[in-house]
């Protein structure tokens, strides 16, 4: 099962890459819908509910990781913490650390250098627009490719391998797409990310989830 989903994710990633090669201006067009040209700013702000969501997406992984680590340590020494689903909880945490943590925020965001929409010339910035998968030196760290906030929504993919029926897996998939897409739209409205940043974020988190599952649960497939 894991191998199928990993291959599926890689195939989707390839065709998404081809799609954005064929339509290189799509990112600019999508971002333009969130840009107020008369005010020279993006319509989404960092106050109120949007500000809370942005804060939550940034700091929830820290809070969650601390709780999980304390719980797992406690389960080693305290009987009442020794529950049936300890491995499942650890799996969900590892998916967070590997997908949104390592792959999204460290490998890509800190090393790809893609300038954010608010930084490019088309939206009153001074940087040159770069398509996805093109490494750039215009941004030093915490850059546009891919979307970190959206990865927290796509992290819900981690529940898919743990659910028994196809219907429940589908519900988890839809929930991840809705949550990740919603957080991605929020960041697009703030000028923080392009559409392709959100798309590839979802793909990367999906693939990393099933890789973690293959390593933790299905080693015999490899």
From Swiss-Prot:
The way it spans or sits in the membrane comes to: Multi-pass membrane protein
Q: List the disulfide bonds.
A: none
Q: Name one GO cellular component term.
A: plasma membrane
Major site of localization recorded for this protein? membrane
What does the record's miscellaneous section state?
Answer: In Francisella lipid A is mono-phosphorylated at position 1- and tetraacylated, it lacks the 4'-phosphate residue found in E.coli. More than 90% of lipid A is in a free form that lacks core oligosaccharide and O-antigen.
The record's section on SUPFAM superfamilies has: Acid phosphatase/Vanadium-dependent haloperoxidase (SSF48317)
Biological process terms from the Gene Ontology for this record are: lipid A biosynthetic process; lipopolysaccharide biosynthetic process; response to antibiotic
Identify the EC number(s).
3.1.-.-
Segments on the Periplasmic face: 25-58, 109-144, 191-193
* Organism the protein comes from: Francisella tularensis subsp. novicida (strain U112)
Keyword field contains Hydrolase:
yes
Q: What happens when the gene is disrupted?
A: Lipid A retains the 4'-phosphate group (giving bi-phosphorylated lipid A) and a 3'-hydroxyacyl chain not usually seen in wild-type cells. Cells grow more slowly in liquid culture and are more sensitive to the CAMP polymyxin B. Bacteria are avirulent upon infection of C57BL/6 mice, the natural host of this bacterium; they do not colonize mouse spleen. Upon mouse intraperitoneal injection induces pro-inflammatory cytokine IL-6 and monocyte chemoattractant protein 1 and keratinocyte-derived chemokine, two potent chemoattractants; bacterial viability decreases about 100-fold.
Where in the cell is the protein located? Answer: Cell inner membrane
Involved pathway(s):
Bacterial outer membrane biogenesis; LPS lipid A biosynthesis
Record-stated family: Belongs to the lipid A LpxF 4'-phosphatase family.
Signal peptide location: none
Q: What is this protein called?
A: Lipid A 4'-phosphatase
Residue intervals passing through the bilayer: 4-24, 59-79, 88-108, 145-165, 170-190, 194-214
Q: What keyword terms does UniProt attach to this protein?
A: Antibiotic resistance, Cell inner membrane, Cell membrane, Hydrolase, Lipid A biosynthesis, Lipid biosynthesis, Lipid metabolism, Lipopolysaccharide biosynthesis, Membrane, Transmembrane, Transmembrane helix, Virulence
KW tRNA-binding (keyword) present: no
Positions on the Cytoplasmic side per record topology: 1-3, 80-87, 166-169, 215-222
